[in-house]
Amino acid sequence: MGRVRNRATAQRRRRKRPGDPPAACAAIAVTGASRAQCPRVQVGVGSHAAAKRWLGRWRRKRRWRRVRKAGPRDLLPSAPTPDPPGPAPSPKDLDLGAQRERWETFRKLRGLSCEGAAKVLLDTFEYPGLVHHTGGCHCGAVRFAVWAPADLRVVDCSCRLCRKKQHRHFLVPASRFTLLQGAESIVTYRSNTHPALHSFCSRCGVQSFHAAVSDPRVYGVAPHCLDEGTVRSVVIEEVGGGDPGEEAAEEHKAIHKTSSQSAPACPREQEQ
């Protein structure tokens, strides 16, 4: 009985010291002791104050781990998402007032949509002194529009290609040229001696315009393909083309190559 009492007394007097490791902090069960005499403890933690300190350190470590994992960008408050743009107002909703009838008449006469009519009016304001020309090929598959003066300065190139196809043209910046329709109907041909992309309609074969290879920002438009009513005068200026001898040699080589590929060989040539 003396040993049992001594062991109970030793267990009752035993307390956790701050330097004890967590593994050594076991539950302290005191037989016959009241709650006022025995402090509140937890298994594996020790006293209540030590448990609070340990829990605070654990929470701080967990928070810093999340901070390092998230990065600085994720910690910043996200900007509020902008409101989606509302639907664009239809032409009927525009407050045109007494000009609505003129607007509809202008749009129907030119066969333009509301956006196209607005573009024409804005271009007229941005290009003062220029005229809005429209044109196309013979069958109507290719249609284009161009802003140019009413008095056209037409270039007559003397190269063999331009002489054969009679391509007189006036030059305009690419920003003033708009292909309205027929992109799928255009066939492009490029000569070895002429730095230009000659575009033809695949149905009727008419060339309405061409683009320069050296400067794609410039278009050459055929004046005879423009619609009537917008051209006031035409001044033709002849310019020199490439070297006639070089062009003739290249043309002869192209003709010989094409004829040799398409024409069958003579029986005598096959025997030799």
Swiss-Prot record:
Keywords (A to Z) from UniProt: Metal-binding, Zinc
Residues that hold Zn(2+) 2 according to the record: 157, 159, 162
Pro residues bias (residue ranges): 79-90
List of residues binding Zn(2+) 1: 137, 139, 201, 204
Binding note for cofactor: Binds 2 Zn(2+) ions per subunit.
Composition bias, Basic residues: 1-17
Stretch list, region Disordered: 1-23, 65-95, 240-272
Coiled coil: none
Cofactor: Zn(2+)
InterPro entries with a match to the protein in the record: CENP-V-like, CENP-V/GFA, Mss4-like_sf
Family of the protein in this entry: Belongs to the Gfa family.
Protein name listed in UniProt: Centromere protein V-like protein 1
Taxonomic lineage of the native organism: Eukaryota, Metazoa, Chordata, Craniata, Vertebrata
Designated gene of the protein: CENPVL1
